[in-house]
Amino acid sequence: MRFRGDPRGTRHLIHEFLSPLANRRDDGYGGTLLQRMRFLIEITDAVRDVWPEEKPLLVRLSATDWVDGGLTVEDSVGIARRLKLHGVDLVDCSSGGIVAAQPPSVGPGYQVPLAARVRQEAEIPTSAVGLITAPEHADAIIRTGQADLVLLGREFLRHVYWPLDAARELGAQVEWPEQYARAKR
């Protein structure tokens, strides 16, 4: 399966437009949430125009800035609703990036509640990220409907066979690619 995912939503220009902490513009791209999301919507429309309809389009959002006066998960629900209207198939929910503030507590799955809330309230599929390392944890996130997809970053870099090992740990029968047979434990 091929898809287009846009990782630029976290700690990058698009998030700088979305966050009221960074966006101090006084034109059509600043001010209200609707105006701050204008740049993202224009990019989304341009990508959707050239991206095949049968392939999913994903957008990463930094769902909260974790500080007063910053982007909130409520804002992100509104953004996700608008993205859905513009052809986005899934919102990947991350957090932070504008200021050095950290979430109240960082631990396995600490961003999962963001994905769950956006999924439920915006009625759009979401992906969960953030210190998800155990196959059972990833499986539980999907099975309980907190997200539709779990994305791994650092864990996959540390353990490139994670998907194959996770499938085995969860009792799924998978065939390892022939080239990887010697790496199978």
What are the residue ranges of the model-derived segments?
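Flavin-dependent oxidoreductase catalytic cores
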Residues: M1-R185
